[in-house]
């Protein structure tokens, strides 16, 4: 965010169109949202602007999964807070994601919208992990 009057910019990486639309409708009043349906598409968007938050599902179509995308995104935009959403809590996945991509948060589906909104707000209140 460059100006306090601007809404934080969020990149939503979600392949389920109905869920993506619902999240955009619900979160769009507080955040400026760009969307992608694959890691490849999201990586292209990273080259077009700076994002404050990267919110991404773990299970995605194509060769790259959510953690793969977040790892690459961390190199391109280290200032962006990284939030992973997964349908299952796997301790190995959580440990890998915490150490490799320095997550701001990891949420397990189903996620209540207010929990998601508060998680994004909490992430924005602090620098991205690894940033001062």
Q: Which residues are covered by each model-predicted region?
A:
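Acidic, metal-coordinating helix/loop segments flanking the phosphotransfer/catalytic sites
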Residues: 35-53, 58-61
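Short amphipathic alpha-helix used as the core "switch/output" element in two-component signaling
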Residues: 44, 67-79
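Non-catalytic signal-transmission and effector/linker regions of two-component phosphorelay proteins
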Residues: 1-11, 17, 40, 75, ...
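Hydrophobic/aromatic residues positioned on beta-strands within the core alpha/beta folds
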Residues: 85-86
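A Lys-centered signature of the CheY-like receiver
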Residues: 109
